[in-house]
Design a protein with these regions (language model features):
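Extracytoplasmic gate region of multi-pass secondary transporters
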Residues: 56-113, 168-176, 206
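Interfacial helix-cap and linker-helix signal at transmembrane-aqueous boundaries
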Residues: 1-4, 84-85, 116-117, 121, ...
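A late C-terminal transmembrane helix in Major Facilitator Superfamily
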Residues: 110, 180-219
Length: 262
């Protein structure tokens, strides 16, 4: 952007995204073949209806948890550049390097966390404990990071950015593994679909609300406080609203949902 303008950034990243098509198509072709082989010998089991999922407290818990995670994610993605330039005095070039490096940290931590939790479970650890500890650490840490960026010195604010990205990356495997465990093969697709539809409303709310708050106050402090509060909501969703992480008994839930005769 500094050397070639903002249009070049869209062109470059648009072209780079096309590189993903070839390996994705090859993997998809192999998966389709495997799915056909499994489906040929599988016994079809009906999925729970959408109405039953909407009555499930745990589904609303994961949706709230994802909304909370996504609020801070979209807040940072949309406003971190301006924050670094306007509030912390970085040049556009330095801002780009810092922001890019922080997302590299997020990606690496996502890979490491996925590997670590799988190894922990294979060695006899509890999926319930493992995933919930990670989600609690990520959301509790995000609260502290938002406060560090709002009120901290320059070094503390920069450290908070990188710690936040590391925690967000580490928690990302759980966002999809948890509904897979709870929903099982019968309900995972619908569960994740509802969860993502609700959770990604944060992508609408966070950029707009942040812009409104900055316009009204002239600084980022209140916006960071709101983001910290949203992170606390994630603790309610992931810890307060979820049962033990194991596949839910959909037959029992369906029977319980049937009204009894007067």
């Amino acid at each position: 952007m500094v050397n070639f303008g903002w249009r070049s950034a869209f062109l470059v990243f648009g072209a780079l995204s096309l590189l993903w098509l070839w390996p994705w198509a090859r993997v998809l072709r192999r998966q389709r073949q495997e799915i056909r082989r499994v489906a040929d010998g599988a016994v079809e089991v009906p999925s729970p209806p959408m109405s039953l999922l909407l009555q499930c407290r745990a589904m609303w818990g994961t949706a709230l948890g994802l909304f909370s995670s996504n609020y801070t994610f979209y807040f940072m993605m949309a406003w971190l550049p301006l924050y670094l330039v306007r509030e912390r005095g970085f040049s556009v070039d330095d801002m780009a390097k810092l922001a890019s490096a922080s997302y590299v940290v997020m990606a690496v931590c996502a890979l490491l966390a996925g590997w670590a939790i799988d190894r922990y479970i294979r060695s006899g650890g509890s999926a319930n404990r493992g995933y919930k500890v990670i989600m609690a650490a990520a959301h509790g840490g995000a609260v502290l990071c938002m406060l560090g960026m709002a009120f901290g010195s320059q070094p503390l604010a920069l450290a908070s950015i990188f710690v936040y990205q590391a925690l967000t990356g580490a928690s990302s495997p759980g966002v999809y593994a948890i509904p897979e465990i709870l929903g099982g093969t019968r309900a995972t697709g619908r569960w994740v679909g509802i969860q993502n539809s609700l959770g990604n409303l944060a992508g609408i709310a966070a950029p707009w609300l942040t812009g409104f708050l900055i316009d009204q106050t002239g600084h980022f402090t209140v916006a960071f406080l709101v983001a910290a509060a949203m992170s606390l909501l994630g603790l309610v969703g992931w810890l307060g609203m979820l049962p033990k992480l194991e596949e839910l008994d959909w037959e029992a839930r369906a029977l319980a949902a049937v009204p009894t005769a007067p």
